[in-house]
Every structure is written in structure tokens, then in C-alpha cells.
Amino acid sequence: GFGCMRFPTTPDDKIDESEAIRMIRHAIDNGVRYIDTAYPYHGGESEIVIGKALKDGYREKVILTTKLPVWLVKTHEDMMKFLDEQLKKLDTPYVDFYILHAMNNERMDLMQKLDYKRFYADAIAQGKVRYPGFSFHDDFELFEEVLDAADWDFCQIQLNYLDWTLQDAAAKTALLESMNI
């Protein structure tokens, strides 16, 4: 996959759009099929650059993921508001995976209170999201609780191939495999 948290920048710390677009398209032209971004990446500009890179038939070649900035959500309606804003920035009618970003105990409580399941059902029914998911940044016990809270299609964990003990990556990966996620 191609993560879009960090792109080359210009001296004034803006994304070097032409270089970022060249990199994304080069990756796709050479077999990369997964593009990952999120609302806060590059101060909200990453999604805009990706939208430009995925023009001219490139969108149809990839699985596109972006993330709901859970820490900014205050109401149930905010979830759809952020999704619509992100779809506009990405210049696409849908994302393949829309994931709750950086879930932890506090954020999971908030999402449950605001009925994230209804949001996902609505977004999927409207054709804006294909699959729900979450990214996770907390301990293994809560990880199990989040997994049990819904019928998830997708999960991103922090994983370092050189240190499988970091963030309980080995245990989390084994659990995800056992659940076919």
C-alpha cells in the first residue's frame, strides 16, 4: 500500500503536489492498489492531492481508505459532515474503507454514544462507503472490546515488522486473523 501521511514538501512546507502526484501514480502503475490517507494528514491537504492524483482513471485502479477524525466529532451529524467534506476533497463519490481514526477507550465510548453503527449503515446505503473499519492505538484488552462491538470489515493496527511486541502487534494480528478481518 501507499500511505499518504507524509509527502515531499516545498521550502514553505506545502505539499509538493507535482512530486506527490508523480509518486502516487508511479506506485499505482507499478502494482500498488491500496491508498491510505486521513483527515489531518498534511494539515488537511493530503486528501486534496490524492484526489488530483486519482484522476484520469487512477481512482478505478485502487482501494481508497480515509479516516474519520473521531476527536473532532461532537454530534452524530458530524460524522456525515466530515465524510462529505472528505469525499469532496478526494473528488470521489465513495471510499472503499472509511475508518474510525486512532481508536482508544475514550473515543470508542464517544462513537458508541453517537451511534456510529447507524452512521455507517446510512453511509453504506448512500453508496459513500463500501466497508467500515477502525485504526487502533490502545491496549489489547480494549482492542478485543472494540472488535466485539461491531461486525467490522477492516482494521489497521500499529505494526513494526522488526518488533512484533510493540503495541501487542503479534497478539492483535493473530486475533484479527482468527476473525477473518
Outline where the language-model segments fall.
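Active-site groove signature of glycoside hydrolases
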Residues: 87-108
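Acidic (Asp/Glu)-rich catalytic clusters
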Residues: 29, 51-61, 84-93, 124, ...
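Short, acidic/polar
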Residues: 13-27, 74-91, 137-147
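Structural motif corresponding to the early beta-alpha repeats
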Residues: 41, 57-77, 101-102
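Active-site mouth loops of central-metabolism enzymes
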Residues: 5-18, 67-77, 108-109
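Beta/alpha (TIM)-barrel catalytic core signal, keyed to glycine-rich beta->alpha loops juxtaposed to Asp/Glu
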Residues: 103-181
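N-terminal binding-site loop/beta-alpha segment at the start of enzyme catalytic domains
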Residues: 1-62, 93, 119
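Structural preference for beta-strand elements that scaffold enzyme active sites
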Residues: 1, 33-34, 61-67, 94-99, ...
